[in-house]
Design a protein with these regions (language model features):
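Membrane-proximal intracellular helices of multi-pass ion channels
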Residues: 1-482
Length: 482
């Protein structure tokens, strides 16, 4: 592995983090907040990292998948470490809690260890939202978009940070495609901010929640999340943009080029829409029949929590008090997540479709061994290699949930709570049930559990394979050529 090239890219990433940290620094200085010293030190540390990496780095165009994977993995390690510095240096959180909050933000999980946000400076709250926004599209994807040129490494970096199976052939024009996705991401953020302001929310709060919404994180500037606003238009628009953020941004780009009918012809998006509508109807009916909830209120909280817990993690109602059936539907949505190419995590709707179609193909071939079943996704043939990757990912996803839940239960969590927390952290959702319900935080968990969940959140965001590759001895051998 060419460690010098990896260091060179990490140096540029560190300088980019310094530039990002400078934004809340300006807010802290203008607002005369006590956090300005913490942000100033964070900027200096980021610059120091950039200089240190640059000292032992050099650019190169001769890169392999191994360098791309290393850059992605260590890029996330570096980004989350530098991102935790304002919390740590400002004495708002201890080391592990600061790291947890940073990873939670960048991975779009939205799980917080702040006991309360009252008294926390706006610059710190804004930085939490920035981590959600940067990590939503992807630290590496945004970094690629801001690079003045593209090369072989960008393809490997993009693949390593990928967000689900896709049949789009974007690699030959990867840099152009990434810039386009970044522009769409910006446009969505601006539109969301403007609409939130029309709903009566102040600009600073509207911008913060827009970044968290489009980044599908769920961080809020208030302890009671979106329940704080008691604003129906705000909730409905938030639900709409959470739903859109759970869709494929590359699909939106194609719709811009070829027309909106592309979206409706996409099998994954249609399935995603169907899942959201079906889950909303089931939960609303369950709330009406089991709790006697008013129909309009049941529909309101159902549509919000369905779109939220399949992507983001905002809270508009205490779903801990809901019937078991509704909780199980929400838990299933956490597992599924959003679409491939979205800012949401989970197993992705595309994988769910392929798993179901592959199972159907196996059943048909059992009935007729000579039958050849062609598996497609939106009209494109899916080969055996991709089906194998999808099946392997699904197995590993369930394995991570099982291991995480086992370790949490060993640390004292109730079995159902442990499973729910494992699902919500690997799915990068945030709120779960029990000890970390809609109205709770992750602060009561032990350091052991928090450390486990830090790793689980990263595994979920990087889709397991990238981090598992680091455990392969051949990855670190100088003589091994990938």
């Amino acid at each position: 592995m060419n460690i010098y090239t990896v260091n060179y890219i990490l140096s540029r990433l560190s300088f980019a983090m310094a530039a990002a940290l400078a934004i809340p620094l300006v807010l802290a200085i203008v607002g005369k907040e006590a956090s300005r010293e913490a942000f100033m030190l964070s900027v200096f540390v980021s610059i120091f990292f950039g200089i240190a990496f640059r000292r032992y780095g050099s650019p190169s165009d001769d890169l392999t998948p191994r360098e791309g994977i290393a850059i992605t993995a260590f890029g996330w390690f570096t980004g989350t470490f530098l991102g935790m510095l304002p919390y740590l240096l400002g004495h708002y959180l201890g080391f592990l809690d600061a790291l947890f909050e940073s990873i939670s933000g960048f991975t779009g999980t939205g799980a917080t260890v702040f006991v309360t946000l009252d008294g926390v400076p706006y610059s710190i709250l804004f930085w939490r939202m920035m981590t959600a926004w940067i990590g939503g599209l992807g630290i590496i994807v945004i970094f690629i978009a801001l690079l003045p040129q593209s090369g072989a490494s960008t393809i490997y970096m993009y693949s390593a940070e990928g967000s689900g199976p896709t049949l789009d052939r974007v690699m030959p024009r990867l840099h152009e495609m990434t810039v386009a996705l970044f522009k769409i991401y910006l446009i969505f953020t601006v539109i969301t901010t403007a609409i939130f302001m029309v709903c009566g929310v102040d600009f600073s709060i509207a911008l913060a929640h827009a970044m968290s919404t489009i980044g599908t994180c769920g961080f809020s500037t208030y302890d009671d999340s979106t329940m704080h606003f008691h604003n129906l238009p705000f909730e409905l628009w938030t639900a709409l943009f959470m739903f859109l953020a759970g869709g494929s941004f590359s699909l939106y780009y194609r719709a811009y080029i070829k027309g909106p009918t592309v979206i409706l012809r996409n099998a994954e998006f249609r399935t995603y829409l169907g899942i959201v509508l079906a889950a909303t109807l089931l939960i609303a009916l369950n709330l009406i029949l089991s709790m006697g909830m008013d129909g309009s209120m049941a529909a309101r909280v159902a549509i919000f929590q369905v779109t939220s817990l399949s992507t983001t993690g905002f809270v508009s109602a205490d779903f801990e008090t809901w019937p078991t059936f509704s909780k199980m539907v929400l838990l299933l949505l956490m597992v599924i997540g959003g679409c491939a190419g979205s800012t949401a995590s989970g197993i992705k709707v595309a994988r769910l479709i392929l798993l179901v179609r592959n199972a159907r193909a196996v059943v048909l071939q059992k009935l007729n061994p000579n039958r050849v079943v062609d598996i497609t996704l939106t009209g494109a043939h899916v080969d055996g290699a991709m089906l194998l990757r999808v099946g392997t990912f699904f197995f590993l996803y369930l394995a991570v949930i099982f291991v995480t839940a086992f370790l949490l239960a060993m640390d004292g969590l109730l079995p159902f709570d442990a499973v729910a927390v494992a699902i919500t952290t690997i799915g990068n959702i945030g709120p779960a049930f029990g000890i970390v319900s809609a109205t709770s935080t992750y602060a009561p968990l032990s350091d052991f559990s928090k450390a486990i969940l830090c790793l689980t959140m990263l595994l979920g965001r990087l889709e397991i394979f990238t981090l598992l590759i680091l455990l392969q001895p051949s990855f670190w051998r100088r003589t091994h050529r990938w």
